[in-house]
Amino acid sequence: MGVRSPSSADSATIADDIAIIRSMHTEAINHDPAITFINTGTMQLGKASLGAWLSYGLGSETENFPAYMVMLSQGTGKNPGQPIYSRLWGSGFLPSEHQGVLLRAGADPVLYLDNPPGVKRSQRRGQLDDLARLNQAFAQQTGDPETLARIQAYEMSYRMQASVPDLTDLSKEPDSTFDLYGPESRKPGTYAANCLMARRLVERGVRCVQLFHRGWDQHIALQSQLPRQCQDTDQPSAALILDCLLYTSPSPRDCKT
């Protein structure tokens, strides 16, 4: 029958539509190797993450975003919680184009996306074309696949200069959407806001969206800390699944994560 918790009442309503992995275990006694194992299949560094494998195996459905994107949030249950490292969404030995790209809250959602000061978009296009020719020549000379991945990264950044502002503009989202995800969804960087952003990424064709929410390491004060942490995630998680299911097919909001 399972254990029921009032702290996850909304999540209980979508339990039939989510996958919970109960078979995974590790001999690691510390958080870092354990979470590395969960995300990469090994406690050792240097292996590809789950999202990178999905990108590598299934490819991308959009030219305007990476196939794998990641968002972080800090919970209210325990602050600051355990650290999160970028290797958890790394590509390991796979081509670097498959690593996750971090989407942040605020005015600069993706680092190093803007053109240098004083450089117009047309000038940037010319620079990238010249740079691509040089990189192509170097790739033919050395056979280094990372050189080709670098070209793809530059081109993706150029396209994202137009696609990211549209992604992060929530002005056309109705109030009913924010009501569905909860009041925290209006606050950039919260788990609720990231869930809403995850739906927007999925409907734009991003293959894998991964949300990390820190603050689950409750050793003490469970009665006060754990309910707050669950409150962060319960309604938004259920809303994300319901939002995807509501527009499954033939609508463009086809949830594939």
PLM features: what roles do these ranges have?
Residues K256-T257:
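N-terminal low-complexity segments that are often proline-rich with Ser/Thr-Pro
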Residues M1-S249, R253:
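Ligand-binding pockets and gating/stacking loops
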